[in-house]
C-alpha cells in the first residue's frame, strides 16, 4: 500500500541552535553564536520541523516554436524534516512525507545535505549520471553546498552558494545548475531530459520557501536546447496537524538501514570519478525494491543487516563507472 502511494506522488518530485564546534585544521574550534557561520547554521536548521507543504509549478514561456506550455500543477501535503546528522560544519536534513488520506502514515522522501566551505560538490551531468566538481578557494570561502538525494538516497543534484540576509530575510542561492527531471514530469512525459535551475531557499516567519526558476532542456543532439521556462514555489508552513510520534517510530525502525544505504552511495562520491545509473529515465527498478526492504524492516519481516545486504546488491546492479556518451544514456 505504501509503495503504491509513492508511485502516485508525482507532485512531490518523488530550531534554535547553540554554539557548535567545528573542525579547522584538525583542531576543534568553538565559534561564537553571533558569527556568520552560526547565523548560517541557524538558517539551515530552521528548515527542520513539521510542515504543511504546497508545491506550485507553472510553465511560463515556450522557448521552442512547436511547444505549448503545460497546465499549472499544484499539489500539497504534510512533510516532517528531521536533523539526522549535525557535525557543526555539516548538517543533514531528512524529509519524511505524511500521506494516505484519512489513515495517514509516514514515508521517506528526499534528503538535503549542507556542507560548509566544501572542497567538492556533487554535480548532475545528464542521463542519470553525476560527477564531483572541485570548488575553488574563492568560491568556497564562507559558502555552503547543498546536495540533494532521492527517496532511496541515490543522488539528484548539488550546488554551492552563500547565505545572505538582505532586508532581514535569510536566503541561499547558488549558481545555475542542472538537475534531473522531477518525478511529476519523469513519470508523465518524455519530451525533455534535464532542468537548468536557479534554486533559492528563504526562511520566513511561518516556515520557509523553496523557489525555482527552471529551464527545461532537450539533450537529444548532445547539446542543450531550451524547451520552456518554469517558475516553481514550494511553501513550507509550520503545523501541529501531524502525529509526530508515528513519524518518529517509523524513522527509529528504519534509520540504521538508511544509514547503511547512505554509506553505499557515499562510496561513489568518495571515489571522485563520474558514475551513472544503468537505468534510463525514471529509476523505479532501483528505488522501489529498496523502499520495499525498508517496509519489511518496519513490519518486522527482515533485519536491517539482511536488508542492507540486499540493498547493496540492488545498487551494484544498477550503477556503473563506465559511462556511455550522454545521448546513449537518455531514454
Question: Can you say where each PLM-predicted feature lies in the sequence?
Answer:
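Positively charged n-region of N-terminal signal peptides that target proteins for export
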Residues: 1-4
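N-terminal helix-cap/turn-to-beta initiation motif at the start of protein domains
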Residues: 34-50
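N-terminal intrinsically disordered, cationic/polar leader segments
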Residues: 64, 86-126
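Hydrophobic/aromatic beta-strand elements that line small-molecule binding cavities or substrate pockets
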Residues: 69-71, 75-85, 94, 111-112, ...
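Short helix-loop boundary/capping segments
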Residues: 142-196, 216
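Acidic, serine/threonine-rich low-complexity disordered tracts
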Residues: 193-331
